[in-house]
Structures are given as C-alpha cells and as structure tokens.
Amino acid sequence: MLILTRRVGETLIIGDEITVTVLGVKGNQVRIGVNAPKEVSVHREEIYQRIQAEKKK
C-alpha cells in the first residue's frame, strides 16, 4: 500500500484521468473529492461491499 500525506487543497493523481483532492479535515473526518471518467466506478468501501453482496444473490 502506498501511503501519502496531503494537506487541504492538495491533489494526487491516479493514472492519467483520476484525481483525488483533499477538500477538508474536521476532527477525524476527511472530505475528499474524486474526479474520474464516467466509466470508472467510485464507491465508499461499505457501499462497494453491499453491491458485491447483492451480485452474489
């Protein structure tokens, strides 16, 4: 796992088309913004797990 440190307003780039920006930090919560092409699914982990569980039914 790659571990990075970013400050509010800083961005990291994944591949050529995906950016992840730190929008804010409040207590133990971090707000991030993700820009990705429409064909790339972006989900919170708990939502992704629910989707995968539904596919198995």
UniProtKB/Swiss-Prot annotation:
One of its GO terms (cellular component) is cytosol. SUPFAM superfamilies: CsrA-like. The keyword Repressor applies. It comes from the Bacteria. It is found in: Cytoplasm. Transmembrane segments: none annotated. InterPro entries: CsrA (IPR003751), CsrA_sf (IPR036107). One of its GO terms (biological process) is mRNA catabolic process. It holds the Pfam family CsrA. Keywords: Activator, Cytoplasm, Repressor, RNA-binding, Translation regulation. One of its GO terms (molecular function) is mRNA 5'-UTR binding. The keyword RNA-binding applies. PANTHER family: CARBON STORAGE REGULATOR. Homodimer; the beta-strands of each monomer intercalate to form a hydrophobic core, while the alpha-helices form wings that extend away from the core. Belongs to the CsrA/RsmA family. A key translational regulator that binds mRNA to regulate translation initiation and/or mRNA stability. Mediates global changes in gene expression, shifting from rapid growth to stress survival by linking envelope stress, the stringent response and the catabolite repression systems. Usually binds in the 5'-UTR; binding at or near the Shine-Dalgarno sequence prevents ribosome-binding, repressing translation, binding elsewhere in the 5'-UTR can activate translation and/or stabilize the mRNA. Its function is antagonized by small RNA(s). This is Translational regulator CsrA. It comes from Buchnera aphidicola subsp. Acyrthosiphon pisum (strain APS). The lineage of its organism: Bacteria, Pseudomonadati, Pseudomonadota, Gammaproteobacteria, Enterobacterales.
